[in-house]
A protein has these predicted regions:
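Short alpha-helical transmembrane segments in multi-pass integral membrane proteins
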Residues: 1-21, 81-148, 190-245, 303-368, ...
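Hydrophobic alpha-helical transmembrane segments of integral membrane proteins
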Residues: 19-20, 181, 243, 287-288, ...
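Transmembrane alpha-helix boundary and packing residues in multipass membrane permease domains
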Residues: 24, 28, 40, 79, ...
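Transmembrane helix-bundle signature of multi-pass secondary active exporters and lipid flippases
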Residues: 25-79, 143-150, 239-306, 326-334, ...
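Helix-loop interface residues and adjacent transmembrane-helix termini in multi-pass membrane transporters
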Residues: 33-36, 44, 50, 84-87, ...
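Small-residue-rich hydrophobic transmembrane alpha-helices
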Residues: 53-113, 150-169, 277-335, 339-341, ...
Length: 461
């Protein structure tokens, strides 16, 4: 890890970001396949594929909540560990990781119990209809059992990335994705298990990835070791991690709340086809967003380490390169979606009527993702430098202050009420990006100035 530390602190930033970001981008693309491969196979189940796809789509809010709880711990814990490494405090970094591991086990047990007891009620609340509840219930009953594997794979995997081992993180995702792609057709079509087979394939794949992550963190190659003596939850170390991770948690968990609002409104105005289209829109949005998030995750160790080491010039250069990279990608993917919406919709279903409906909705829903690279770059930088308040504010404004009310306002302003619901997304995104850019410009300068002053004080003592 001494080589990794030297690399994070001294290597040319362009080459360093490329080295760290490529594996994380690949991992995010693989993760995207991992998340949507079930839907692709399910959408092609003979006879009732469209209803099955809609049913699994209703499960997505719950799955988002499970992932959000992993992010609550890891997205704050991993940057805090990186900052501690930058300060030379490796003991605290290992205690942070151990405490986060214990918290994830506790959260996994609670989530599993809640899902097994109230699964059907939650699915009905999240937009399942009498036509889709059977498929949704079958999927979630099995998926809930594998909650612990999801928590540990996502949560502890972040600590691998935080150390600069982005290739290992990529392998973690690759193992799970390949396993899922192989197991899905076997269970869905070979054993004729349908959506139950898709869920079983997913949790078995997550279990394999989980074993890989834990073996690495307990092994010789990991600089930060997962040790039994560090499993005690030290509030002074772990609670600041939760505060920092709250922004990511709000972003991800709010997706489930937003999904409920979208699904209920779409069911009201457009019926099952509108909800089915929303499942596809969410999948395409993941395709658009995950590579940007991968670039940002590749930048996180560089930003956190150098901020901890009070090397503000490298922090500024890394942010600028991150911003340019995210914006370039967001413009490219926006252009592809605008030009070929039918192609993206056709990946998920052979139903021509659903493809035609989705293609129109897709151009609306993804209308301003061309500038969303600004949002991703600013938010990841807030998290990477430990600015919990601003990262939380940005998350709350976009989801709760803007998008949530707009889901109900826009249908009243547009003649086609179904398309009005979809329009809420681009309107909210445009306002949110503007707000984030202004807030970041002010707060980033303050953070760098404060770090520079602290560095001068230390050098004069």
């Amino acid at each position: 890890m001494s080589d990794h530390k030297e690399m994070l602190g001294t290597a040319p930033i362009g080459k360093l970001l490329f080295t760290l970001a490529v594996p994380t981008v690949v991992a995010q693309l693989i993760n995207m396949l991992y998340n949507i491969v079930d839907r692709i196979y399910i959408g092609h189940i003979p006879g009732n594929g469209s209803l099955a796809l809609t049913g699994v789509g209703v499960c997505m809010p719950i799955i988002m909540i499970i992932s959000a709880f992993a992010a609550l711990i890891a997205s704050g814990g991993a940057p805090k560990a990186s900052i501690s490494i930058g300060k030379g405090d490796n003991d605290s970094a290992e205690k942070i990781m151990g405490g986060c591991f214990s918290l994830q086990l506790i959260i996994s047990a609670i989530l599993t119990a809640v899902l097994l007891i109230w699964n059907k009620d939650l699915l009905l609340m999240f937009g399942a209809s009498e036509n889709t509840i059977g498929f949704a219930n079958d999927y979630m009953n099995i998926y809930a059992i594998g909650t612990v594997f999801v928590q540990l794979t996502l949560g502890m995997g972040a600590f691998i990335t935080a150390q600069g081992y982005t290739k290992t993180s990529m392998i973690t995702v690759l193992i799970g994705a390949v396993s899922n792609i192989i197991l899905d057709p076997i269970f869905i079509f070979g054993f004729k298990m349908g959506v139950k087979g898709a869920a079983l394939a997913t949790i078995l794949s997550q279990a394999i990835s989980c074993v890989w992550v834990l073996l690495f963190l307990c092994g010789k190659k990991s600089y930060l070791k997962l040790k039994k003596q560090n499993f005690r939850i030290d509030g002074k170390l772990v609670f600041p991690c939760i505060a920092l991770g709250a922004a990511t948690f709000i972003m991800q968990s709010s997706e489930s709340v937003i999904s409920v609002c979208f699904n209920s409104s779409l069911l009201k105005y457009g019926g099952d086809i509108a909800v089915g289209a929303m499942t596809i829109l969410t999948s395409v949005m993941q395709f658009a967003m995950l590579p940007m998030q991968g670039i940002a995750q590749g930048a996180q160790p560089i930003l956190s380490y150098n901020f901890g080491a009070k090397n503000t010039e490298r922090v500024k250069k890394t942010y600028k390169l991150l911003l340019v990279s995210c914006l370039t990608y967001s413009f490219i993917i926006w252009g592809a979606i605008m030009l070929f919406p039918q192609m993206f919709a056709g990946i998920f279903t052979p139903d021509t009527s659903l493809i035609a409906f989705t293609a129109t909705a897709l151009r609306i829903y993804c209308g301003v993702i061309c500038i969303f690279g600004i949002q991703i770059a600013c938010q990841m930088t807030f998290v990477s430098i430990g600015n919990a308040p601003c990262s939380i504010i940005v998350a709350i404004v976009r989801k709760f202050v803007l998008l949530l009310p707009l889901i109900y306002i826009m249908p009243q302003l547009i003649a086609d009420k179904t398309m009005g619901v979809y329009t809420a997304e681009p309107v909210a995104d445009l306002i949110a990006v503007t707000f984030t850019a202004i807030l970041f410009t002010v707060q980033f300068k303050k953070a760098l100035k404060s770090s520079t002053i602290e560095n001068l004080k230390e050098t004069t003592q």
